[in-house]
Design a protein with these regions (language model features):
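Short loop/turn segments at secondary-structure transitions that flank enzyme active sites
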Residues: 79, 167, 176
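A short, polar/proline- and glycine-enriched secondary-structure boundary/capping micro-motif
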Residues: 178-186
Length: 216
């Protein structure tokens, strides 16, 4: 694809978009280090820049209804990552525990080149905090990724990690909260994680999110 044919389109956070008209419709690409990536089909894009907290709040607005909206944590984490990329989406009402067979670790296939890292949580709280934080901070300010947790009781969960300055921020888009990392570490047996903001998405990601509908 010859990028010189495309005009610079909208700007969302740090992501530039290129576009051209195909069969009367605008098609968009994300410019990543001068390499154009075609945008995912059938997903709308945000019309304005939103804060991280605003994007998190939009991911799973039906959480209070219970049911599937409390069993879709992977969809919620994915929706947050897509919203930070400029997509106007929310989590699909899919029981992602069933959709992924409830297994950990698992390569979800939402990203090209995803590589799952594992962190066995030490029993010493202070050591656990330092060791995991050091692992995440090495990715650098502004980086973002998926965190999957195997709790000590055998259950699992999915959330988002971000690096903000010299701090690790853990977001739970399923219930719209910023999490105390030390609490997660105390309750967890194993963390599985990988960085997402530097990876390209696959079409499979569209199966677990839907276009945002503020009227729901």
């Amino acid at each position: 694809m010859d990028e010189r044919k495309y005009k610079v389109g909208d700007l969302y956070e740090r992501n530039h978009f290129r576009r051209r008209k195909i069969n009367g419709e605008w098609r968009y690409w994300r410019d990543d280090n001068n390499r154009a990536e075609e945008m995912l089909p059938n997903l709308k894009r945000k019309t304005s820049i939103m804060t991280p907290n605003g994007d998190m709040a939009a991911c799973n607005r039906q959480y209070s209804k219970g049911g599937v909206y409390r069993n879709n944590c992977i969809s919620c984490a994915l929706a947050y990552d897509l919203r930070r990329r400029g997509y106007d989406v929310e989590a699909a009402p899919i029981d992602t525990t069933s959709a992924t067979n409830g297994s950990l670790p698992i390569q979800l296939g939402f990203y090209k080149g995803e590589k799952l890292e594992m962190f066995e949580v030490p029993s010493d709280d202070e050591a656990a905090m330092k060791q995991f934080s050091d692992r995440i901070l090495k990715y650098g300010d502004g980086s973002r990724g998926l965190l999957r947790i195997r709790w000590k009781n055998g259950d699992g969960h999915a959330a988002i990690w971000e690096v903000s300055g010299d701090a690790v921020v853990i977001r739970d888009p399923q219930n719209n909260t910023i999490v105390d990392l030390s609490d997660y570490l105390r309750r967890a047996k194993t963390f599985y994680y990988f960085r997402t903001d530097n990876l390209k998405l696959t079409d499979k990601a569209t199966e677990f999110v839907r276009n945002y509908n503020g009227g729901d």
